[in-house]
Amino acid sequence: MLAVPPRFDVRSRPIETARLLLHPLDATDSRDLWNAVESSRAHLEPWLPWVPFNSDLDSSGRYAEASAADWDAARACRFSIRDRANRRFIGVIGLEAFAHLHESVELGYWLRTDASGRGLMTEAGRAVLDWAFGPVNAHRVRVAAATDNHASLGVIRRLGFRFEGIARQAERCNGRWLDHAVFALLVTDQRTIS
């Protein structure tokens, strides 16, 4: 079974990397979440179907509150990603779709445009995978990205995921159907992280 560490415990002791702090997303992140999405809307909309629905500060607040509730109900664990040096909010990474019986989760993430291209999402991904295979007790982590989302596919490859196949027209986003490249990583896989 999956084991979900209490949100308040993780909030008081966030996951730290060389450049990042990851703490559970909650209502205190609402304004920063809104600003990050708004400043990166054109970059995010082609790949993430929820972006048009994040239309104002209230919608960001509802999402942040729902994220906290999902964590408390052991449905998902979403983290705000902050720059460790200045505490600036730069994105979200999380484990979604908890299948407790099968010890399986899905990885999801996004980064604001002006933080892209510096290896920050790969760094956050490594930390969350360590957490997933450690305290959360996941056996399998799945991730998918649009077949033409080269930045996301690069993160997935650098994290050492194994390609499993193509899910045709898996998601409708911004008026077009996206094929997804599907990958997974098992706790028993040797993690060849580049």
Regions found by a protein language model. Give the residues of each.
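A short hydrophobic/aromatic micro-motif that marks alpha-helical segments and, especially, helix-coil
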Residues: S55-D56, W71, Q190
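Tryptophan-centered motif/residue detector
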Residues: W47-W50, W71, W110, W177
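Conserved GNAT-fold acetyl-CoA-binding loop/helix
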Residues: E45-A66
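Short, polar/charged, Gly/Pro-enriched helix-capping and turn/loop motifs at alpha-helix termini
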Residues: W47, V51, A74-R78, H139
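A generic secondary-structure signal
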Residues: A66-S67, W131
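Short loop/turn motifs at secondary-structure junctions and domain boundaries
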Residues: A69-A74, F161
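Acyl-donor (CoA/ACP) binding surface of acyl/acetyltransferases
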Residues: M1-D32, A36-H43, R78-S194
